[in-house]
Amino acid sequence: MKRILAINPGSTSTKIAVYNDEKAVLVKKIMHTREELAPFKDFMEQFEFRKQVVLKTLEEENIPFEFDAIVGRGGLGKPIEAGVYEVNQLMLDDVTKAVRRHACNLGCSLALTISKEFPGCRAFIADPGDVDELDDIARIGGLPEMPHEPIWHALNQRAVARRFAKEHNTRYEDLDLVCCHMGGGISLAAHRHGRAVDANNALDGDGPFTPERTGTLPAGDLVHLCFSGKYTQNEVMNIIKSHGGLAAHLGTNDMMEVERRMNEGDEKFKLYIDALAYQISKGIGGLSTFFCGKVDAIILTGGIAYFRYLVEEIKRRVGFIAPVYVYPGEDEMEALALNALAVLTGCREVKEYV
């Protein structure tokens, strides 16, 4: 039996899961209050705090301190291929100085440091958000100094794609898929035979708008906003990443509230949900052109995939391209654990971060 601890640091929470082989024995989301995080100027400063939270929780839950592997959510260091990577010092250095700051950058350092508490324990990351396998034609943008760089939900998209393949008695590596993860960020990717050959930057301004992100904006208007004198660089980035989309239009990023207001007959809320469904559908349609329309399946996943009206609108618009399959929610903890298990059992090769 292989014992695995998965760690997923988020902006205001740390999720942990303990697995015995494929069986979860603990899954816990530890919320962090604003007061707890206030002393830290940057996510990376939270390392020791998060580490102690993880160890304390394991102790409180009476989890034996015996693990074969610790697997962390990968950070936003430099672009890499999909897969499972052994954590090394170069990886820690890259995420520490990464331009894009996110709590997920703590995942590899937490995995490595905690693994040292247990003799023989290994430290991994799997399918981080900066997985970059773009085809050459997908990388080219309108300026040489601004090539397209994907930041997407690689972990969940690839896990759901593998699940779909298993359910249909085939291999992920034999399929052409368009996948869309719909949450606070919305990522779309074209998966050709196990590689995401095109994907958007779902973090800071590419693709559909989301509950809280602007998505793609008119470049000229954005330039005027930046030089209006009203905003600093950080304020503009916060608008793009945290205060755009439905939050800007409707005053809330709570999709349960949005769905309730729409169901109560609020036409404004319905209009913006229709617009969101349309933008997601445009993204799916655009990616289908990579395959010249010959797509095996379209997969919708993420927390917003529970929103029935939105999903049905997307299906109505893109169903002519390929069958649409819906896997609501996300299980990144299971995906992390199973990726680590695949390496420990010899089913998948671990990669070296270089």
List where the protein language model places each region.
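Phosphate/pyrophosphate-binding loops at sites that engage ATP/ADP/AMP, CoA/4′-phosphopantetheine
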Residues: 54-69, 167-170, 284-296
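Short beta-strand-loop/turn "lid" adjacent to the catalytic site in phosphate-handling enzymes
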Residues: 58-103, 122, 130-142
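Glycine-rich phosphate-binding loops at beta-strand->alpha-helix junctions
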Residues: 295-314
